Every structure is written in C-alpha cells, then in structure tokens.
C-alpha cells in the first residue's frame, strides 16, 4: 500500500468526516468506525475523485467501505 496515497486519503477522510486524523487508519470503516452516513460517503467519493483526478463508478464506490479499500482502488486506477 502506497504510503503517499494512504496519507492523502487519510487527510481527505479526516477533513470530510470531521474526525481527528489519528482516528483514521487503513482498516477504518467509513460508516462503522468513522460515523459516515450515506451522504458523507457520496461526498467522500467525490472528494477522492477530485483529489486523485480519477472516476469512481457507483458500482465500485459501493465496494469501498474502508480507507484501505479506497487506497487499493486508487492505486489500481493510477497504475
């Protein structure tokens, strides 16, 4: 897992969900651990798309439940 991408995703998640950066780990679940609701999740996906200049299709977004899932998806898209 790319440390650079992980740090950037953690920063975005912390900002979008208004949680302390120290609470955001690679295995943190957006809804169960970080308190995100469905709207938060949509906004988070949009922020990740913008930050990494990628497109995350709805089907893929549904499979992204943790910070690690997001990092893995971004790594695959960025090649």
Curated annotation (Swiss-Prot):
Domain called Carrier: residue spans: 3-78
One GO location term (cellular component): cytosol
Post-translation changes: 4'-phosphopantetheine is transferred from CoA to a specific serine of apo-ACP by AcpS. This modification is essential for activity because fatty acids are bound in thioester linkage to the sulfhydryl of the prosthetic group.
Pathway connected to this protein: Lipid metabolism; fatty acid biosynthesis
Annotated InterPro entries: ACP (IPR003231), ACP-like_sf (IPR036736), PP-bd_ACP (IPR009081), Ppantetheine_attach_site (IPR006162)
Gene Ontology molecular function terms on file: acyl binding; acyl carrier activity
Family membership noted in the UniProt record: Belongs to the acyl carrier protein (ACP) family.
Cited function: Carrier of the growing fatty acid chain in fatty acid biosynthesis.
Protein name per the record: Acyl carrier protein
């Amino acid at each position: 897992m790319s440390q650079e991408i992980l740090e950037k995703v953690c920063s975005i998640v912390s900002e979008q969900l208004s949680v302390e950066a120290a609470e955001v780990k690679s295995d943190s679940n957006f809804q169960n651990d970080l308190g995100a609701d469905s709207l938060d999740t949509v906004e988070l996906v949009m922020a990740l798309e913008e930050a990494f200049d990628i497109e995350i299709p709805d089907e893929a977004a549904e499979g992204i439940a943790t910070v690690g899932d997001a990092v893995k998806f971004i790594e695959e898209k960025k090649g």
